[in-house]
Amino acid sequence: MTKWFNVGKIVNTHGVKGEIRVISRTDFPEERYKVGNTLYIWDEKGTDYLTVKVTSHRQHKTFDLLTLEGYNNVDEVEKLKGSLIKVPEEQLGELAEGEYYYHEIIGCNVVTEEGEALGTIKEILSPGANDVWVIKRPKGQDLLIPYIDDVVLQVNIENKLVTIHVMEGLL
């Protein structure tokens, strides 16, 4: 059975020539949405998908704008709004050491270098220079941890465990 990974969500159309506006859920939009790449657009129920090829990609504000082969006007892409864009596991490329896919990080437990459990990574934000990991704590508000070398000391994907250094003001 194929394992699928969410790489974006179609939130709207853009213009009249069939562009779709995508909120990306991938660290590598320039690779993922490269012209000629195959993507799979899943219906909102998650039961069926369309196979499409990317014919153009550009970034606009915080969105990725795509056009797809065979979809040439706004009426043809209107029905895709709300759909998820997914790729099968075999389309995931190898990463360099110290790089991780979102699905590998989300769900990891986070502990301090002293061994104190802080919570579980529930989301990854990409606001600018570096990613920010959102940690759901057992009690209280979520904790935001910057993904920088000074803070994230060790990531153990096999054991789903991240060890961090608590800098002053972080907690």
Curated annotation (Swiss-Prot):
SUPFAM superfamilies of this UniProt entry? PRC-barrel domain, Translation proteins
- The PRC barrel domain is annotated at 96-170
Specify the superkingdom: Bacteria
Tell me the keywords, alphabetical order.
Chaperone, Cytoplasm, Ribosome biogenesis, rRNA processing
Chief subcellular location equals: cytoplasm
GO MF term set? ribosome binding
Q: Which GO terms describe its cellular component?
A: cytoplasm; ribosome
The record's subcellular location field reads: Cytoplasm
Kindly indicate whether the keyword rRNA processing belongs to this entry.
yes
**Which InterPro entries does the UniProt entry name for this protein?**
PRC-brl_dom, PRC_barrel-like_sf, RimM, RimM_N, RimM_N_sf, Transl_B-barrel_sf
UniProt xrefs under Pfam families: PRC, RimM
Q: Which GO terms describe its biological process?
A: ribosomal small subunit biogenesis; rRNA processing
- Per the database entry, which stretches of residues form a coiled coil? none
The record's note on quaternary structure and interaction partners says:
Binds ribosomal protein uS19.
Family under the similarity heading: Belongs to the RimM family.
State the function annotated in the UniProt record: An accessory protein needed during the final step in the assembly of 30S ribosomal subunit, possibly for assembly of the head region. Essential for efficient processing of 16S rRNA. May be needed both before and after RbfA during the maturation of 16S rRNA. It has affinity for free ribosomal 30S subunits but not for 70S ribosomes.
Q: What does the domain comment read?
A: The PRC barrel domain binds ribosomal protein uS19.
**Protein name as annotated:** Ribosome maturation factor RimM
